[in-house]
Amino acid sequence: MGIEEKLPSGFLLTTVEGLAGYVRKGSLWPASFGLACCAIEMMATAGGRFDIARFGMEAFRASPRQADLMIVAGRVSQKMAPVLRQIYDQMVEPKWVLAMGVCASSGGMFNNYAIVQGVDHIVPVDIYLPGCPPRPEMLLNAILTLHEKIQQMPLGVHRDEVARAAEQAALAATPTIQMKGLLR
């Protein structure tokens, strides 16, 4: 389909990878997965004061098939976890996940059976954004950090290897139910 399929493995010039990373980072299409108060701050980021359109993200996509960045904003319940994974699986490659807020990152103050203690138990997370709720400036900083990470991503079969290894490492976390004495 693209240049990464046409060229043999290992035969990519650094400038081509750099150019592809530059283009890719400037055209992220986010899918918002707003579940709590963090979603309000995410919507404020799209407003005129903070202007997320400067980074090529002016339209939040309603369909995961059109998005390559998922911003999980807020707490995820156990019933919502399969839906989150299904949306992640429907996104186009390459795809990235940003966990926005303490609830998405670690469950927040909701340490009970109904809330997933961090979305990294469901999908691999690329950037963790702390705060309750994080301000739009922090979200923009996290997006710029993600831009730097995207710029360094390789092309071709190497990209698939890196993505597969990152997903395996991210989902290898110990479930919090197995962590004894967490709040004692």
Curated annotation (Swiss-Prot):
Pfam family membership, one: Oxidored_q6
SUPFAM superfamilies: HydA/Nqo6-like
Record key words, sorted: 4Fe-4S, Cell membrane, Iron, Iron-sulfur, Membrane, Metal-binding, NAD, Quinone, Translocase, Transport
Coiled coil: none
Catalytic activity entry: a quinone + NADH + 5 H(+)(in) = a quinol + NAD(+) + 4 H(+)(out)
Molecular function in Gene Ontology: 4 iron, 4 sulfur cluster binding; iron ion binding; NADH dehydrogenase (ubiquinone) activity; NADH:ubiquinone reductase (non-electrogenic) activity; quinone binding
Family: Belongs to the complex I 20 kDa subunit family.
Record text on subunit structure and interactions: NDH-1 is composed of 14 different subunits. Subunits NuoB, C, D, E, F, and G constitute the peripheral sector of the complex.
Function per UniProt: NDH-1 shuttles electrons from NADH, via FMN and iron-sulfur (Fe-S) centers, to quinones in the respiratory chain. The immediate electron acceptor for the enzyme in this species is believed to be a menaquinone. Couples the redox reaction to proton translocation (for every two electrons transferred, four hydrogen ions are translocated across the cytoplasmic membrane), and thus conserves the redox energy in a proton gradient.
PANTHER family given in the database record: NADH DEHYDROGENASE, NADH DEHYDROGENASE [UBIQUINONE] IRON-SULFUR PROTEIN 7, MITOCHONDRIAL
Name of the protein in its database record: NADH-quinone oxidoreductase subunit B
Biological classification of the source: Bacteria, Bacillati, Actinomycetota, Actinomycetes, Mycobacteriales
